[in-house]
């Protein structure tokens, strides 16, 4: 779709769902809505059922972490209209305590995507039929895609041949983290940096 058609679509959505849409923008040929968290289910139902929108195909829902914000998480929904041949991205914001309404009632395929966002970020989804971890182990501590999660994690999980079972141990680093100097010509940089002009002459 061209920019004008996307602008017309955004105006149509905003006109029909004024309480749900906070703002919208067109970037790289795709329409993105910033929506109110508590209106996400009615908004997505409208996007699916309205004949001008017809976003019947649910593609994805994922989380994004912005730890500097008071509402640190964004939940991002991607929808596709195969009949109209266009896509839309819908973003909502939430904090660590406030649950986001689940959209499993609209698209059952959202089930595992919401579980993944819960497992990786700790984002809560209200009225989800089975909100439990899906990728990490049962006793896993923390939320691994949060930007404040330690790079090494908390525990090392390995199979022990002597005990014939999986064991958990605190992480032990064999060496300290390396601090790479990306401005050093010895680290593979091909451009000349100030003061290094003689290196090219020799």
Curated annotation (Swiss-Prot):
Subcellular location: Cell inner membrane
Reactions performed catalytically: a quinone + NADH + 5 H(+)(in) = a quinol + NAD(+) + 4 H(+)(out)
Alphabetized GO MF terms: NADH dehydrogenase (ubiquinone) activity; NADH:ubiquinone reductase (non-electrogenic) activity; quinone binding
Alphabetized UniProt keyword annotations: Cell inner membrane, Cell membrane, Membrane, NAD, Quinone, Translocase, Transport, Ubiquinone
Keyword Cell inner membrane attributed: yes
SUPFAM superfamilies: Nqo5-like
GO annotations of cellular component type: plasma membrane
Top-level taxon of the source organism: Bacteria
Membrane-topology annotation of the record: Peripheral membrane protein
Listed InterPro entries: NADH_DH_suC, NADH_quin_OxRdtase_su_C/D-like, NADH_UbQ_OxRdtase_30kDa_su, NADH_UbQ_OxRdtase_CS
Chief place of localization: membrane
The protein's Enzyme Commission number: 7.1.1.-
Top EC category: translocase
UniProt family annotation: Belongs to the complex I 30 kDa subunit family.
Function: NDH-1 shuttles electrons from NADH, via FMN and iron-sulfur (Fe-S) centers, to quinones in the respiratory chain. The immediate electron acceptor for the enzyme in this species is believed to be ubiquinone. Couples the redox reaction to proton translocation (for every two electrons transferred, four hydrogen ions are translocated across the cytoplasmic membrane), and thus conserves the redox energy in a proton gradient.
Subunit structure of this chain's protein: NDH-1 is composed of 14 different subunits. Subunits NuoB, C, D, E, F, and G constitute the peripheral sector of the complex.
Name of this protein: NADH-quinone oxidoreductase subunit C
Lineage: Bacteria, Pseudomonadati, Pseudomonadota, Alphaproteobacteria, Hyphomonadales
């Amino acid at each position: 779709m061209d920019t004008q058609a996307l602008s017309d679509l955004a105006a149509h959505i905003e006109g029909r769902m004024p309480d749900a849409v906070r703002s919208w923008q067109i970037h790289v040929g795709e329409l993105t809505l910033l929506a109110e968290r508590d209106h996400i289910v009615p908004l997505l139902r409208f996007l699916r059922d309205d004949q001008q929108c017809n976003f019947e195909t649910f593609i994805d829902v994922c989380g994004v972490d912005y730890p500097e914000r008071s509402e640190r998480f964004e939940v991002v929904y991607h929808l596709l209209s195969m009949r109209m041949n266009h896509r839309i991205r819908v973003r909502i914001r939430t904090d660590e305590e406030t649950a986001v309404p689940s959209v499993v009632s609209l698209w059952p395929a959202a089930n595992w995507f919401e579980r993944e966002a819960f497992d990786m970020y700790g984002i809560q989804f209200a009225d989800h039929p089975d909100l439990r971890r899906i990728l990490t182990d049962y006793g896993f501590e923390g939320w691994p895609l949060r930007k404040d999660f330690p790079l090494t994690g908390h525990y090392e999980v390995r199979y022990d041949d002597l005990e014939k079972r999986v064991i958990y141990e605190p992480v032990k680093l064999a060496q300290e983290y390396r601090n790479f100097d990306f401005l050093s010509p010895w680290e593979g940089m091909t451009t000349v940096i100030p003061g290094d002009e003689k290196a090219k002459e020799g």
